[in-house]
């Protein structure tokens, strides 16, 4: 899908975009490199000490512990694992950095957070269907270069991350109250 995106961006003269791929499983690094290269693109890899330059289209962040830095410099974050039925990955880091999020229909592992993000306008969730990939690509190309919309989405994403934190805080307080109550009953 990212290769199709790069092709589409090139055709639309939006080829000043760097697509950063940060695989959840680093063991997929060589496979990703081969797929990108076989599509006619060069790819730079963090594990080789490469850094992206102005004309690069793909950068593979195949090392651990750098997701925050990558998200911080991103204009838009695509949450992978959401276009296929694997439960979806969490957009929490992206929203905590106030970044606009785009993801597919599979968000089973983080439904409440996705609902908050979409409701707040901080994310776009592509609906499942025969035109899912096409809709994904169209949404991204519409967002790229629309700095006002990206900025608004980023602000909304940050607000939505506050909702998630508030829910977590409330759940923690409730659990502590239950634990406290249980301990008092055990003592009596």
Label each residue range with its predicted role.
Residues 1-188:
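Nucleotide-activated sugar donor-binding and catalytic core shared by glycosyltransferases
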């Amino acid at each position: 899908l990212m290769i199709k995106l790069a092709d589409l961006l090139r055709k639309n003269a939006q080829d000043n975009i760097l697509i950063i791929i940060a695989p959840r499983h680093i063991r997929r690094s060589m496979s990703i490199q081969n797929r990108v290269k076989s599509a006619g693109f060069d790819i730079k890899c963090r594990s080789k000490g490469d850094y992206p330059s102005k004309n690069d289209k793909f950068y593979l962040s195949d090392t651990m512990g750098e997701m925050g830095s990558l998200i911080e410099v991103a204009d838009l974050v695509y949450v992978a694992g959401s276009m296929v039925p694997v439960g979806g990955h969490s957009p929490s880091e992206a929203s905590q950095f106030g970044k606009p999020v785009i993801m597919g229909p599979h968000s089973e592992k983080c439904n409440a957070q996705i609902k908050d993000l979409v409701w707040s306008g901080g994310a776009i969730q592509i609906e499942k269907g025969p035109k899912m990939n096409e809709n994904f690509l169209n949404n991204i190309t519409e967002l790229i270069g629309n700095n006002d919309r990206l900025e608004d989405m980023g602000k909304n994403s940050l607000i939505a991350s506050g909702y998630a934190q508030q829910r977590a805080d409330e759940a923690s307080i409730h659990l502590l109250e239950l634990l406290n109550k249980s301990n008092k009953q055990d003592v009596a």
